[in-house]
Amino acid sequence: MINYVYGEQLYQEFVSFRDLFLKKAVARAQHVDAASDGRPVRPVVVLPFKETDSIQAEIDKWTLMARELEQYPDLNIPKTILYPVPNILRGVRKVTTYQTEAVNSVNMTAGRIIHLIDKDIRIQKSAGINEHSAKYIENLEATKELMKQYPEDEKFRMRVHGFSETMLRVHYISSSPNYNDGKSVSYHVPLCGVFICDETLRDGIIINGEFEKAKFSLYDSIEPIICDRWPQAKIYRLADIENVKKQIAITREEKKVKSAASVTRSRKTKKGQPVNDNPESAQ
């Protein structure tokens, strides 16, 4: 029998531990982000080597408590409260921070979207119609008609834009398992932040507020649905997303085949062997 009284006590203990851990990390951080409500989040902390064992012990405690709390499903604890667990990056030579666009995604069915639109339309009409609300309702009705073209269980992805988050460009030392031939490795800083052990941090940390846009997104090739009900969101049909993913995979595979054929052709040319660019003609 599951002891939910103990589970609730454990959860309260975890929340207190987590809040204090994050508060101390923010207080000593070289960089923090601000959440939409003003809370400091994503602390980036350069950690003296002599403190790594004590911080790792606290991280291990976080991990154990989070895993134990998963045994109490009826408490309905959001996974975002328990995870991710903070991390210590080791074997780092140099770190540069930069900003990138953050996107929150949520999946909804066409039926759910229509329900929320209908609810908002009723609220707007009950408050009285003016020029602004009339245009707003008109936009909602247009989106509703679009959604009615699909089955109620047709799935859509709503991607909310409009805020940024911190990324790291990490250079590891050559003996690190994460070494990337001298090239940097991107690291997404979660809300709980990250620690960077200073033992090998010869070239230090560079705090860069520069904003970098992703070079390519599969969503670039899909026409989004825009609805005033969600002004900072773009809505995409999941089936369209999957189709683009498949096309990207096909294109990538075709490039591999062409590249392999090009290498083979080059090798044969060097050896003085004849090259047949149309294998079917040999049949």
Curated annotation (Swiss-Prot):
UniProt keyword list: DNA-binding, Repressor, Transcription, Transcription regulation
Protein name according to UniProt: Repressor protein C1
Renumbered residue ranges of the record's region Disordered: 254-283
Transport listed as a keyword: no
Stated role: Sequence-specific DNA-binding protein required for the establishment and maintenance of lysogeny.
Domain of life: Viruses
Alphabetical list of InterPro entries matching this protein: Lysogenic_reg_DNA-binding, Repressor_C1
Molecular functions (GO terms): DNA binding
DNA-binding region per Swiss-Prot/TrEMBL record: 30-49
